[in-house]
Curated annotation (Swiss-Prot):
Protein name: HTH-type transcriptional regulator BetI
GO terms (BP aspect): glycine betaine biosynthetic process from choline; negative regulation of DNA-templated transcription
Pathway recorded for this protein: Amine and polyamine biosynthesis; betaine biosynthesis via choline pathway [regulation]
PROSITE patterns documented for this protein: HTH_TETR_1, HTH_TETR_2
Record has DNA-binding as a keyword: yes
UniProt cross-references to InterPro entries, sorted A to Z: BetI_C, DNA-bd_HTH_TetR-type_CS, Homeodomain-like_sf, HTH-type_TetR-like_transc_reg, HTH_TetR, Tet_transcr_reg_TetR-rel_C_sf, Tscrpt_rep_BetI
Keyword Oxidoreductase appears in the UniProt entry: no
Molecular function GO terms recorded: DNA-binding transcription factor activity; transcription cis-regulatory region binding
Known function: Repressor involved in the biosynthesis of the osmoprotectant glycine betaine. It represses transcription of the choline transporter BetT and the genes of BetAB involved in the synthesis of glycine betaine.
Organism: Burkholderia vietnamiensis (strain G4 / LMG 22486)
A UniProt-annotated Pfam family: TetR_C_6
Residues covered by the HTH tetR-type domain: 8-68
Alphabetical list of Gene3D superfamilies matching this protein: Tetracycline Repressor, domain 2
Key words of the record: DNA-binding, Repressor, Transcription, Transcription regulation
Amino acid sequence: MPKVGMREIRRAQLIDATLRSIDEAGLPGTTLASVAQRAKISTGIVSHYFGDKDGLLEATMRHVLRDLWAATTRRRVAARKDPRARLRAIVAANFDDTQVSAPVMKTWLAFWSQSMHEPRLKRLQHVNTRRLHSNLCAEFAKRLPRAKAREAASGLAALIDGLWLRGALAGGPIDTRAALKLAHDYIDLLLASA
C-alpha cells in the first residue's frame, strides 16, 4: 500500500529532476530514463506518473506556471488598487526568482519550441498568453480607453517576452533590474497621457 502523500512527493522529485535535466542536457537529451536516474527512481515510475516525455514537460510547465501565477497574485495584492503599481507587479512576477533560474529559463525555451508541435502544450501556452494579456488589459483599462488598453497590453506583453527572451539567451544571469526599468519606463510612457 502506498504511503499517504507519496504521489505528490514523487511528482515534485520528478519535476525537479526534469528541470535539472533540461538545464544540463536540453530537451533532446532529457528522457524518462535520464529523469529517473536524476531522481534515483525507476523509469517505470516516471512513466506511471507522466506517461511520456511530453506529459513530463507539461507537468513541469504547469509547476512553473503555478509559480508564475502565485508570484503575480502575491505582487498584485501587495500593489493594492493602483493600476501603475499593479502593472509593475505583473511585470515583476515575470522576472521573479522562480522564473529566471537557468533550469526554469531553459525549460521555458524548450516548452515554447515544443508547444508549436504538441497540442496539449500549445493549449497551455495559449492559456498563459491569454492570462497575461487579460491581466495587463484589465489594469490599463482603469486608465485608458478600452481599445488603447488592449493595444497597451499587447505592447507590454511583447516587451516582457522580449526582455525575458534576451535575458535568457544572454548566457549569464538575467539583469532583472535593467529589464524592470525598461518595462516601468514603458508603463509610465503609456500612462502619461491618461
